[in-house]
Amino acid sequence: MSVRHALLFVGLICLSISAVGQQPRGQRPPEAQAATPPANQPPKPANMETRKDVAEAPPVVTQHQIQVGGKTLRYTATAGLMPIRNTDGDIEANIFFMAYTLDGQAARDRRPLTFSFNGGPGSASVWLHLGAIGPKRVKMQPEGLMPAPPYQLVDNEFTWLDQTDLVFIDPVGTGYSRAAKTELNKKFLGVREDIQSVGEFIRLYLGRYERWSSPLFLVGESYGTTRAAGLSGYLVEHGIAFNGIMLISSVLNFETLEFTPGNDLPYILYLPTYATTAWYHKKLSADLQDLQKLRSEVEQWASTGYAEALAKGDRLTADERNAVIDRLSRYTGLSKTYIDLANLRIDEPHFSKELLRDRKLVSGRLDSRFTGTDSSPLGETTGFDPSMSAIRPPYTAMFNQYVRTELGYKSDQEYYILGGGFRFQDWNWGPAVTGFPDTAEALRDAFDKNPFMKLFVGSGFFDLACPYFATQYTLNHMGLTAQQHQSVSLGYYGAGHMMYIRDESLGQLKKDISAFMSGALK
């Protein structure tokens, strides 16, 4: 696992999700009598017994309203810490969450409820929260570029709150979520540990806020899709079944993404996104300007001629090799000499550096439409991602202002937005003994045990972190039945990993999710 991938993708872990589903759950907090909620407001969490004089801080509850489509949405926001206890009742960690419930709902326990988180591992939920789903969003330029400071937070006319209540979860080591003691980090920092603690949070929330009978949805982005897949299998084993799972920029089978010796699959699956990126930056010939035809042509050749050539390896004849070099150069915009030196195999870090080298620019990884400069024009790869650099400052500034001034949650602790909460090497990836991790197995398991579950998968055409063709490959190799495939919906967008930073893609994502949720509730 390269450092470049460290904050968005899991390393080579080997995790049997079915085994994860059978790990013992944490001790439930002592039972308490639930209070009756005031009219049109969610119930307050029941008072929970504490142990060893460790008191829980009550969540902060505030009232708000926004304008959406000419209508006023009035809602209640709750921000606070959910304690995670051990079998003795001691608090071992606190998970920070922000929840939004629409006011004026007669049967709240029947209103849909969606749990949301981002990825990393090490990323807080701020990206989906203030980018796509929540009632407020960070205002970017129309194509997703960073605006000039000071940044703005505006009403999100594309919020999902009109259809579902929302809960944003920051796993331990992200946001304000912390282990109670440093030595307890190991109980939360790991693939299995993370699934268990987030699963325990969901169980606790359903109980404390009396939402056990609500239709349930789960949405994750990037490594959050890995977590969501694991949770779908883990929680169904504990009696919690979801109506729908939404995967944004997904990675389930890591064999499709990891450029390691002997694994040619990523080179094949990245190629359509390389071509799309080269098209965007005007690196392709005049006869390749129809983007839809270009993608279809490259997908077809990548799956056939290119895959066959890589399978032949050193057995390729000189003529065969030259033909592949010609085709790769045509589709990627890279020189034939460079492709030859790369042995027909271009990984993402080298592609992002080489494509625009003649312009002294590098292209983005999370969103390959973005460009930037770096300090080493002669370097083989770039040291930063210009798309992340454009997104991070506005989201960091606006969240820290928003959580204090609008949600009323004040803390001197640093809110870990992306990294900083733990060392990457402290994450427990599990025993690497069975090859690449493939959490699609957990999702398949959930489909088998919950035949009513629906799946939505959204991908950006300019995402070089989780390329759309790799996602297609994974979905087509899950072993789903024809009927199960009918429960899968796909969405594609003309942007990158965080497709919602682009106004047009944000609107389309909202339409797609709205239709998906309506179908999942039938």
Segments the model singles out, each with a brief description of its role:
Residues 312-465:
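Alpha/beta-hydrolase fold catalytic core
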Residues 210-222:
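Alpha/beta-hydrolase fold nucleophile elbow
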Residues 496-505:
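Catalytic histidine-centered segment of alpha/beta-hydrolase-like enzymes
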Residues 135-139, 233-333:
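A catalytic-pocket lid/entrance helix-loop region that shapes and gates access to the active site
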